[in-house]
Regions:
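Extracellular carbohydrate recognition and processing domains
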Residues: 203-229
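A short beta-strand element within beta-rich, extracytoplasmic domains
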Residues: 165-179
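Beta-strand signatures of extracellular beta-sandwich domains
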Residues: 62, 186-190
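Noncatalytic modules at the cell exterior or secretory-pathway interfaces
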Residues: 229-248
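Extended, low-complexity, turn-rich repeat/linker tracts enriched in Gly/Pro/Ser/Thr and Asp/Glu
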Residues: 175-185, 195-198, 248-252
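C-terminal interaction-tip segments
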Residues: 245-264
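Intrinsic low-complexity, repeat-rich intrinsically disordered segments enriched
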Residues: 1-112, 123
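Terminal (often C-terminal
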Residues: 82-163
Length: 264
């Protein structure tokens, strides 16, 4: 609508102002309102631009290209900032756990073994991967002791120490066997409370994600899994571990697990 040839009484509701008693813009931030007093989400001063909605939504700020694709998006409902045509969360990061068939050569059937985080190495070679029991899920606690699969020096390479609060967005894995006969395999991702300087090293285990059982037919093919995320939020100072289990020992396995997450 144009204001041309209109009376002020006909257009005043469409005029935005700083609600500053006719003193103009100052150093004090003021909410922008329309002529009848309705408030906007915009606040303004001579040095500050501030947005604060009356109700949270998924599109507080949108920057789009000429085709209408979102290039920048502020989501105040979920407290996220996204960018790019794919609307990716801007602080998205990735973490990796892995093992190879050489390390897996000492795995026992139906036992949960923790996998190395990042590019960590083992002080005790293939005897070092910590084991977390034979239950349906890995054990929710872990005690360190001298011996294969229980040393603190073997636990450290499999722990991801979370420095900030994070949210897990997705987990994917690849696995491959080293003989023509495979097994049924399964994997889990857990968080734990870590106690420094104690043999009661891990407690309060929580299932974060898991994959569906893989009926692995052997070394002729590799398998990809897209996991179910069971509990997405992990608080700072927790540790995260990934586990692999096979129901038999027909093959040894190479495994690569990728965790997609963002800071929160």
């Amino acid at each position: 609508m144009s204001f041309t040839d209109k009376k002020l009484s006909d257009v005043y509701k469409d005029i935005l102002h700083t609600d500053n008693s006719n003193t103009g813009i100052s150093s004090t931030i003021k909410q922008i309102k329309c002529g009848d007093g309705d408030a906007t989400a915009l606040y303004l001063s001579d040095s500050v631009l501030h947005l604060r909605p009356s109700t949270d939504g998924t599109g507080l700020i949108r920057v789009r290209d000429a085709d209408g694709n979102n290039l920048f998006l502020v989501d105040s409902t979920n407290d996220l900032v996204k960018a790019g045509v794919g609307s990716h969360i801007v602080n998205t990061q990735y973490a990796q756990f892995s093992t190879n068939s050489g390390e897996g050569a000492v795995f026992s059937a139906n036992t949960h073994y923790a996998l190395t985080f990042g590019h960590a190495n083992f002080s005790n070679g293939i005897t070092g991967l910590p084991s977390f029991g034979t239950g349906t899920d890995p054990a929710t606690s872990f005690t360190t002791a001298e011996g294969n699969h229980t040393r603190s020096g073997d636990l450290v390479p499999v722990m991801w120490l979370v420095s900030d609060n994070i949210t897990i967005d997705a987990v994917y894995s690849l696995e491959g066997a080293d003989t023509a006969t495979g097994d049924t395999t399964r994997m889990h991702l857990f968080s734990y409370t870590f106690t420094s300087g104690s043999t009661s090293a891990l407690a309060d285990g929580t299932l974060l994600a898991h994959n569906s059982d893989v009926t692995n037919a052997g070394s002729e093919q590799a398998y990809k899994s897209t996991w179910t995320v069971d509990s997405a939020n992990v608080d700072a100072n927790k540790v995260i571990l990934a586990f692999f289990e096979a129901d038999s020992v027909n093959s040894d396995y190479s495994v690569n697990i990728r965790v997609k997450y963002h800071l929160r």
